[in-house]
Amino acid sequence: MGCVFSTIEDNHIHHINNMMELGGAEISGIKLHAAIDVLIRRNHIHHNTMGIWLDWEAQGARITQNLLHDNDVPEGSIKLEGGMESQDIFIEVGHGPTLIDNNILLSRYCLLYTSDAADEGL
């Protein structure tokens, strides 16, 4: 529960996992478990295999005023069996409200939300 009540702001996060040496879970510009009452704002996040990933038990989190772009699998890369997809924001198994507002999302895929009981993304 180390990130509860945290603020992550004004960072420039880029070029995470571009060599594709790690193709499974846990790879992202910002990756948090149990993001309870966390604020992620005014970050510039680009050229990662995934931008922001809030996993398991996110509630009361807010993602605001961020610029995300080019968060895609690098050109020519081979997708690994069981590897994760790429997008700017991924909310997985959230337990409460998550507010996503006033962001600029410019990657090929901007948002994946898999927190409902049916496990269907938006």
PLM feature segments, named:
Residues 30:
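Extended ligand-binding clefts on enzyme/binding-domain cores
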